[in-house]
Amino acid sequence: MAYTRMTAAEAAALIKNGENIAMSGFTPAGVAKATTKELAKIAVAEHEAGREFKVGIFTGASTGQSTDGDLANAQAIKYRAPYTTNPDFRKHVNMGEIPYNDLHLSHMAQELRYGFYGDVDWAILEVCDIEEVGNDYHVYLTAAGGISPTAARLAKKVILELNSFHNANAKFIHDVYEPLDPPYRKAIPIENVGDRIGKPYVSIPKNKVVGVVE
């Protein structure tokens, strides 16, 4: 398949100081893990050189050490939402070092769509499979979706982490759907346990995907 493969370090090097990143996943499940770990290393090097380096991080829920923990320890977070539990992150918030909005998880995608946090410069999504369909990639999420469809649609550029630990058949577990926002929201049309209202993948224009970390 014709996409640009890159290392996590190469992907992280594309992200600039001050940019906003929206990520896949819900808790550590489904969160991209490699790129943010390298981004923390970049932040440490930039700070040691006397340069500012911080990014905004928006997710569906808590992440894990490689995102909330490593970036907090690297003094690399300019703003964070929503709810999160990582102990290193909590420590830095309670020291007054990180502007933090303990937003209810269910509001994160909607508030990004409203534009409350500015532009979404990057989406970083963990996926288990990628299909090329016309001018788009259909990407299949791993263990959790979170705000992935909103992140991918709003982002100017997208990095995919193709996690081979997950069986490609995991792509059948998701029903990807974005509701309308208030005041136009309608009832979510699920009435029976087998109902499906969305798609099993997130569709992303090829020209937005700058690289795939494998």
Predicted regions and their residues:
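Conserved alpha/beta enzyme-core scaffold
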Residues: 1-214
